[in-house]
Amino acid sequence: MKVSDRRKFEKANFDEFESALNNKNDLVHCPSITLFESIPTEVRSFYEDEKSGLIKVVKFRTGAMDRKRSFEKIVVSVMVGKNVQKFLTFVEDEPDFQGGPIPSKYLIPKKINLMVYTLFQVHTLKFNRKDYDTLSLFYLNRGYYNELSFRVLERCHEIASARPNDSSTMRTFTDFVSGAPIVRSLQKSTIRRYGYNLAPHMFLLLHVDELSIFSAYQASLPGEKKVDTERLKRDLCPRKPIEIKYFSQICNDMMNKKDRLGDVLATAQRIRRRYNKNGSSEPRLKTLDGLTSERWIQWLGLESDYHCSFSSTRNAEDVVAGEAASSDHDQKISRVTRKRPREPKSTNDILVAGQKLFGSSFEFRDLHQLRLCHEIYMADTPSVAVQAPPGYGKTELFHLPLIALASKGDVKYVSFLFVPYTVLLANCMIRLGRCGCLNVAPVRNFIEEGCDGVTDLYVGIYDDLASTNFTDRIAAWENIVECTFRTNNVKLGYLIVDEFHNFETEVYRQSQFGGITNLDFDAFEKAIFLSGTAPEAVADAALQRIGLTGLAKKSMDINELKRSEDLSRGLSSYPTRMFNLIKEKSEVPLGHVHKIWKKVESQPEEALKLLLALFEIEPESKAIVVASTTNEVEELACSWRKYFRVVWIHGKLGAAEKVSRTKEFVTDGSMRVLIGTKLVTEGIDIKQLMMVIMLDNRLNIIELIQGVGRLRDGGLCYLLSRKNSWAARNRKGELPPIKEGCITEQVREFYGLESKKGKKGQHVGCCGSRTDLSADTVELIERMDRLAEKQATASMSIVALPSSFQESNSSDRCRKYCSSDEDSNTCIHGSANASTNATTNSSTNATTTASTNVRTSATTTASINVRTSATTTESTNSSTNATTTASTNVRTSATTTASINVRTSATTTESTNSNTSATTTESTDSNTSATTTESTDSNTSATTTASTNSSTNATTTASTNSSTNATTTESTNASAKEDANKDGNAEDNRFHPVTDINKESYKRKGSQMVLLERKKLKAQFPNTSENMNVLQFLGFRSDEIKHLFLYGIDIYFCPEGVFTQYGLCKGCQKMFGLCVCWAGQKVSYRRMAWEALAVERMLRNDEEYKEYLEDIEPYHGDPVGYLKFFSVKRGEIYSQIQRNYAWYLAITRRRETISVLDSTRGKQGSQVFRMSGRQIKELYYKVWSNLRESKTEVLQYFLNWDEKKCREEWEAKDDTVFVEALEKVGVFQRLRSMTSAGLQGPQYVKLQFSRHHRQLRSRYELSLGMHLRDQLALGVTPSKVPHWTAFLSMLIGLFYNKTFRQKLEYLLEQISEVWLLPHWVDLANVEVLAADNTRVPLYMLMVAVHKELDSDDVPDGRFDIILLCRDSSREVGE
């Protein structure tokens, strides 16, 4: 029978159904057709619907395949058959997953259900509570079972490859679906993919006797019949036959082609029954696990790694048969364990490790490095801190001991390394995994899957170290290892923290490091802390910040290697020994690097000059550029991309993208420059690195040392600062920026070394001193100097960026340097023309007009002609003719005779004379009659050689200079370059600087650029012709957009000056001649930009959003540029919103209901959370009644409990008068000055009362009648409930009340932070379950909590102060 067939059923009587529940015989079990699967469910409660008259049953789906709908309450109608006096209901197999706590702290019931479905492909198998812990082992250590699966498949591949003609083996690797042999395609990638599918079945085989599921499964089979593979496939109902196929086939080979999986299960059942008969099942059940594990080990060829007590291979039947012959059979089959004897450590282990890693010629750098390696490897000191200069070789201090530990066969050590930034992960894993000496994997694998039994070293970042999942796994290490590996010889080795000074110096990240204090440091054999910039004071504070005791009070010399007598207290309580190699060696660090401090007009321009010069001298070298902001990083990358290959990184990129880009720069030899913020200055080791350039005006001494320290073998470090703009200020408590002056002296002061100010040897690699530099570095400096002199003499002014780079608009920069190929070609032509004019004038035009043409020919053509093209006849000619008469004739007469006449004699005869006759008619004849004969004719012949004659004749009449220069752009380039090369200027012509172009060509290029930009934007934002919003652009579904939509967000949401410039296009904020909007565009780019800004606000608190507005300052006047910047991280923002607002969507979409009883903190800390729904409503109406009587200003009251009077507000007849009353008393002004409303436009809050929130207003006004009925039902004197404007004032006041928000989010655990007013208003209208399970709107609960914070006027008690006191509640804006 089906419930959906209404013709066979009729409504059930409530009383009859209630009695039927007491008599189970009257109930008919029926699968629910309301579910996607036919899953039996359980009746939890039922009630009679007054409207429909149906009895409705509340039931639970506990095993649904759709995880999002698991444990969801479903209401179905109960029907009774006309011919059958029995009721249809729904039941469920035990146990009840929702009832009672699961005896495992790792898994929740939903995950258990997923585990069961993954393993068995069914939902209705019975298992007891002991099975929970067994099944949890799979999730805790999935990595271990994955690794075993990989080994199984590799072993099978080897067998099949060795016996290709064996039909049985080939049948093992034949896909029964397609019938095609797949052994040939079973490559490494395929092995790993199928290994993941095999892992659950591998787990089953190893734990076959520990699960009661198999007992129930075998008990359902008739007699002692074995189950063959095909029967198993049918019974387990696999959705993917490939999973069962591989498992059954591999079991076939493993069990000597005799046993099948069904045989294993049947054997397990027979052994269990025999043991049960003997009454001693519990001790002997473990023997099957030992037998199965031993078979796997032998079959995989791992006998050398494990020691078993078996003398020969025995199958399950042998075990059963042998039971009768021996009563103590369980004593003969012992648990598989690793070899117990421990191999001793020796100093020779370190030397052997070094030879494995670096070859037979390995030697330590110095005696200090040798002794430290021995200290770490041999000594019992539980915690060691090392400070060594950058480039010293700190990595080898733990790398060699790790290799030595891995060589020991008695114990498996698992160690962990943590670095501060994601960008260092790739470099660390490449370095530590080279030569195959260590098995290295990311820490994320350990956190998600557990220890795989193979990895020697896990590498992660500080965030992984502070994560709860990591600390929990370390806390449960002993239990996990014992249950998974059947041995206690897998131990935790070293905990290594690199650059640990960041715990103290990274002020903005210190809140993220709080979880490290929960880590069980005592579980590790040793903790090692390394840094190049951690003096004693910094090191001691950093260690105490993560929960350790700190440094030993007495500084320990490296030569004092005596062992400590008191190690019983554990690592966390024992002081850390500090080895300060910098003080021991008494050498100032970074002396091998040439450090140059330069003040320049334009940092990017100077940096580009240096980089081009470096790559001219050393084409295979690499460089790092450290910028001050993330915006500057992207802009430099865009503008420099046409000169060399660039990789850029900053903190806003995703973790995977950072790792990928860092790895690309380290491994790809063609990559030249790495541009990033300061995160690229720590820990990266690049052999080809020869230059570091720092553009950050706020570098502190640690950032400087770390950046210069990247130059391991010497090189050049440039600190470029803009003139008169050095920022000498602290950043929120961090170290102050470095000062102008000697860098070496500041480094000495930081490390506590003796000052040599004013003494011999003060300058080491700085201030022009080269005495301590290597010969290669000195040679590089000299070659750079010679190249700079050659550029100066050749008059090659490289203008890579505008001089006002920092002040210019970001979008203009991106439009100029980061456009399409067509734009790039335009720039190249412009630069080529400029260089052509420069070289042509130097060789030919030198004798034309003035003596300064030789030196300033580029500026003459680029600036004067463009600017004064119309006035050339009147002003330019007159001025230059004066100089021509005075100086040029004297100076250039020799050059004209020597070079120009010889070169241009042929062209002068045919073209120039006839051409210039028209040219000199009006302008040149009068002034240059003396020079025309000698210089003008020869000059024109050079510039108008073949193709410009016709154009010159027409245009020279008005301005000879401008037209001639314009026409030589196309025709003279080839000849000019040849002439320049003949003159010996080939070296200078390799550079093509960007210069200005004349006005006419600029207009043509500008229009082309606008059209091109318009097409690109239309392709990037194709749906702007429709009613598109930024959430659609990010990829959200329509049902999600409905609740996340940004109601009330318009241009007034933006702060003053952000996308609000006047006199420009309203759609794109560009000049009308450069407008990129297109016809038919309904949604402007400006609107998309302010919506994108609102999305960023969704993800940031007040302080973070304020900093973000400062970061995007270059885009304040460029919404199109900001949209491009926003779209780069489109996927990351989408994921962030999905993660941060999952709870919000679940609540607003009514998929989850807030219950105050689920909030433990609320029940303990607030009387409101123990009130009934009736009491909450009474309190709500009482608050509004008091406000109305006292004529209190509503918004101000809910903002900070200030009971100011505002009679006009209560007497207002419409919204306009209401808002005017608020503005008159200064409410909006106080709101902006006291709260985060100041981060929006001045009219933003005011306009919330006008056209926004229409749907919510309609919904609220419809509910006013319900409020009146509630007051009558409660016996309260009916009072006028607040109208919409007063109600909205309440919500706005609560939203900007920081004290109230913090308290509510603390008490009500189901909600989190929202940072947009429309989301807050929407959230306030959801319903919550009060303590008596009655529903009340959330805003009523908010008002009750707000009232509780202000007074003791609540029923049955007063407020228990937990977080905030009443005195501090007045400080709203702090």
From Swiss-Prot:
SUPFAM superfamilies: P-loop containing nucleoside triphosphate hydrolases
Biased composition (Low complexity): 832-975
Every Helicase C-terminal domain range: 609-758
Family in the record: Belongs to the helicase family. Yeast subtelomeric Y' repeat subfamily.
One GO cellular component term noted in the UniProt record for this chain: cytoplasm
Function: Catalyzes DNA unwinding and is involved in telomerase-independent telomere maintenance.
GO terms classed as biological process: telomere maintenance via recombination
Database matches in InterPro entries: DEAD/DEAH_box_helicase_dom (IPR011545), Helicase_ATP-bd (IPR014001), Helicase_C-like (IPR001650), P-loop_NTPase (IPR027417), Sir1_ORC-binding (IPR021646), Y'_ATP-dependent_helicase (IPR050978)
GO molecular function, one term: helicase activity
Compositionally skewed regions (Basic and acidic residues) per UniProt: 976-999
Residue stretches making up the Helicase ATP-binding domain: 375-552
Region (Disordered): 321-345, 832-999
Enzyme class: isomerase
Residues that bind ATP: 388-395
Motif DEAH box in this chain: 498-501
PROSITE patterns noted in UniProt: HELICASE_ATP_BIND_1 (PS51192), HELICASE_CTER (PS51194)
Protein name: Y' element ATP-dependent helicase YLL066C
Induction, as annotated: Induced in absence of telomerase TLC1.
Keywords annotated in UniProt: ATP-binding, Helicase, Hydrolase, Isomerase, Nucleotide-binding
